[in-house]
UniProtKB/Swiss-Prot annotation:
It comes from Staphylococcus carnosus (strain TM300). Keywords: Oxidoreductase. The gene is msrB. This is Peptide methionine sulfoxide reductase MsrB. GO terms for biological process: protein repair; response to oxidative stress. Its EC number is 1.8.4.12.
């Protein structure tokens, strides 16, 4: 499992995960990334989302219809910037991940988890076993295909 210490985070990763910041839309690593695999918490290495639930939302950030497990994310009321939103944090590391909105695809439950790329790390499908995430292979529709 991949893990990082807080002192290993770059400035943007620290701003996003520890200070509840937001990276620029359309200028982040995973907003337009659709390779098969999983997205893990940058600090704890815990799996949070899969490419199976990722969709194009035109918002400029990675968007997912659901989390891999409700046990790995925490949803909190966020009243910052004069808005009322639902913040998403990692359960294990208490890192800010992004927000969840009710404007996602209806056929997948209507949620859009809008996640900062700086808060997660992508693990390609073909590296899951090697990096200790082999138990997640059954979460993919076409197991064995890359």
């Amino acid at each position: 499992m991949l893990k990082k210490n807080k002192d290993e985070l770059n400035d943007l990763e620290y701003l996003v995960t520890q200070e509840n910041g937001t990276e620029p839309p359309f200028q982040n690593e995973y907003w337009n990334h659709f390779e098969k695999g999983i997205y893990v918490d940058k600090l704890s290495g815990k799996p949070l989302f899969t490419s199976e639930e990722k969709f194009e939302s035109d918002c400029g950030w990675p968007s997912f219809s659901k989390a891999l497990s409700d046990d790995e994310v925490v949803e909190l009321v966020d009243k910052s910037f004069g808005m009322v939103r639902t913040e998403v944090r990692s359960e294990d590391s208490n890192s800010h991940l992004g927000h969840v909105f009710n404007d996602g695809p209806a056929e997948t439950g209507g949620l859009r988890y809008c996640i900062n790329s700086a808060a997660v790390q992508f693990i390609p499908y073909d590296k899951l076993e090697e990096l200790g995430y082999g138990d997640l292979i059954p979460h993919f529709k076409d197991q064995g295909e890359k």
